Each structure stands twice: as structure tokens, then as C-alpha cells.
Regions:
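Glycine-rich phosphate- or other oxyanion-binding loops that anchor nucleotides, phosphorylated ligands
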Residues: 1-118
Length: 118
């Protein structure tokens, strides 16, 4: 993900609060991820979603917006690589536990392929 939305901050846009971050410009300025064609959006919030709602984004988590915010403030390029471990509305705790090994293997493969291309 290169785009980040904070669903909690979105509720405060009337107060001038920012709720979107696009890290593409800083990544491009540093020459990172130029060959990546996919561009996903991560929706972040402080609550655990248990049902599908009308949210902006491709994946949901609870931390990426804050990470992107700090990295942007420090001018550090940031990208978030996510492995979807559960589906909103299903038994997420059980799915998460079952998928940990799959996530570990999938992310390991992703970073090994990435390392070979650098």
C-alpha cells in the first residue's frame, strides 16, 4: 500500500484534520518501487471491524496510517506490505490463527523475490 486513510480522522475533517496520506511522491523522489504497478489503499482505524461497512480502501489494519504519518514527517519513504489473514465478518480470530504460517511463508517469498530484483 502507498495510500493510507484513517477512518477515525475522517470523522474530523470539518475541523481541518487530514485523513489521507499518499506516500507515492516521496517513494518516487528516492527512486523506490518504480517498477511496482499496483497501488493499494490501506484503511486504518482504532476499532476492530466485525462487519462490512462502506469503507475506503483495499485492506484494513490498525497501524499503517500512523506509520505513514511519522515517516512522512521525517521524510522517510514508506510502503506497507500486507498479507490478508482474515475476512471482515467471519471468525477473524480463528482465521488469523490458522493463517499465521501462510502469512509467514507468503511474506518471506515476497521479500526474497524483492531482494533478488534489487
Amino acid at each position: 500500500c502507498r495510500h493510507f486513510v484513517d477512518r477515525d480522522m475522517h470523522k474530523m475533517t470539518g475541523l481541518g484534520m487530514e485523513y489521507r496520506i499518499d506516500s507515492s511522491e516521496l517513494l518516487a523522489a528516492r527512486g523506490f518501487c518504480q517498477h511496482w504497478t499496483e497501488s493499494a489503499t490501506c484503511n486504518t482505524g482504532d476499532s476492530f471491524l466485525t462487519e462490512l461497512t462502506d469503507i475506503e480502501g483495499d485492506v484494513v489494519d490498525m497501524e499503517a496510517y500512523a506509520q505513514a504519518f511519522v515517516c512522512r514527517a521525517k521524510e522517510i519513504p514508506f510502503i506497507s506490505v500486507k498479507y490478508v489473514s482474515d475476512v471482515i465478518g467471519q471468525n477473524s480470530v480463528k482465521h488469523w490463527e490458522d493463517r499465521l504460517e501462510d502469512a509467514r511463508a507468503g511474506l518471506s517469498h515476497f521479500f526474497n523475490v524483492l531482494k533478488e530484483s534489487i
